[in-house]
Amino acid sequence: MQAVPSENLAIDRKKRAKEPFLELDLRPAEERVCDFHEVVIGFTPEQAKIEAARCIHCPDPAPCMLGCPTHNDIPSAMWLIEQGKFSEAAKIYHKTSSLPEVCGRVCPHEQLCEGACVLNKNGEPVITGQLEVFALEQERAKEPYVPKIAPSTGKKVAIVGAGPAGLGCGDELLKLGHEVTFYDSKPAPGGLLVYGIPNFKISKDVFFERWNDMVKLGAKFVGNTYIGRDKSIDDILTEGFDAMFVG
């Protein structure tokens, strides 16, 4: 369900549908061949508002929401960005995604939300992925997101694998008040985000900023531990854990 009901917006949808989309600014090729920094420069606040204003706000549920695996309330986020309410837009993504700053960069948007955008019929879709990144970066620059945490339950959960699946599960468990410990064979958390996807797609700093948020909520990490070889599942369960998630 949309936080900002589309039917309540007095907008000229025909005019919006004809607005040209903004080409993403990329770092010059002569710079990119010398390093592995992110390729996309991203939107300025003014560019973000212009691009978000291309959204025609389809009836709920909008095609972009249905095309998103986490069903992000994209139309509401677009409206808030258009109004310059960037932090409020970021909070929309936090409601349905544990790693929105990551998904905004690495999701195949052209096959998901952007691929489902009705503007594809006569032109280019709203560039929802980079607008998600923009909103999250604006929020972090001003006031990092701090979720509401339930009172401690006294329950302990072991997460095997500190990749995207484990991190998403752990994030939800932490917010529910459980104690969470991640186990991973690598020396640092992140899984594919750190050891698979190159920096020019997503900077490692992006992930570790998000990881630090989880540490502040109480997340613990045990690295260089291969579950099934260095330590068995039974070993973990005998250490006082009430449940286990295998990512």
Residues of each region from the PLM?
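N-terminal glycine-rich dinucleotide-binding loop that anchors FAD/FMN and/or NAD(P) in oxidoreductases
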Residues: 126, 196-223
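Ferredoxin-type iron-sulfur electron-transfer modules and their immediate structural context
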Residues: 1-156, 204, 237, 241, ...
